[in-house]
Every structure is written in structure tokens, then in C-alpha cells.
């Protein structure tokens, strides 16, 4: 049974689109608690010892995040962590960390990049950490309430 706040029309559409077996896996995933992942900031001095000493509950690395992403076994109260406020790491969905693989592979010289939907900023900080030295990133958020 999927979450009750999902409209029945969407459930029916997804079942037709995915087929019975895939829909069952999809519905099960919707009932599970979401995973928690963080991306370490490679430009911070504390980064090298961060995983071992300061982040509790590390539950594996994000395979496509070049050693910068990890899953946590539970969601800690990030707002109480001074390393979070210092920018040592960013709470970021693991799937969005895949962008780093693309940038590191195909962007090999300095570029000017534009992030048109930049709030709350996780992908912008990730993009900047992956661009070659000498690159410029302009981050923009056109939707006022997302700033």
C-alpha cells in the first residue's frame, strides 16, 4: 500500500506505465523512509578527517560521488552541527551527486556555467567543486520563495 496522500489517478497511471512488478517495487519504495546522504566539501581543510571523526552514522559511500558522498544510517539534527554551518558538508540527495561524474568527464577546460534554478544551493556548490580551475559559475534562482 502506498502513502495515502498520493492521488489514485497517479497510482493508476504509474501502474499502467511501469507494469505490475515495477509498480510494486515503486510503491514499496514510497513507503520506506528516504535515505540520507551528504556531500563533503573538498575545499574545506577539515574534509580529510571528516568521515572518520565527525560524522556519526556513516553507512556507506555514494559510488558515483568520487569519494565525496556518503549515506548516513539516520538523519541527525544538522542544524546543531558547526561543521554543517561551516560548509564542511552539504546535505544532498545521492542521485543529484551524479552530475559530478558528467562534469569531471566532459568539462576539461575553464568554462562559464549558469545554474538557472539554484536554490537552495546544493547543486551549485557541487557544480563549482567539479569545474576546472579558472571556471566561473553564476547561480540564479528566479522563484522568489525558493531563495
Regions found by a protein language model. Name each.
Residues 1-147:
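S-adenosylmethionine
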Amino acid at each position: 500500500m502506498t502513502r495515502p496522500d498520493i492521488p489514485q489517478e497517479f497510482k493508476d497511471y504509474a501502474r499502467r506505465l511501469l507494469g505490475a512488478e515495477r509498480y510494486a517495487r515503486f510503491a514499496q519504495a514510497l513507503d520506506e523512509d528516504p535515505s540520507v546522504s551528504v556531500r563533503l566539501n573538498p575545499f574545506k581543510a577539515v574534509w580529510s578527517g571528516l568521515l572518520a571523526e565527525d560524522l556519526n552514522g556513516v553507512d556507506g559511500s555514494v559510488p558515483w560521488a568520487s569519494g565525496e558522498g556518503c549515506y548516513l544510517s539516520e538523519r541527525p539534527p544538522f542544524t546543531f552541527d558547526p561543521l554543517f554551518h561551516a560548509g564542511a558538508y552539504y546535505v544532498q540527495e545521492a542521485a543529484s551527486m551524479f552530475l559530478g561524474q558528467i562534469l569531471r568527464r566532459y568539462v576539461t577546460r575553464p568554462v562559464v556555467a549558469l545554474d538557472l534554478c539554484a536554490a537552495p544551493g546544493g547543486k551549485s556548490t557541487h557544480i563549482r567543486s567539479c569545474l576546472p580551475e579558472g571556471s566561473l559559475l553564476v547561480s540564479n534562482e528566479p522563484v522568489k520563495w525558493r531563495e
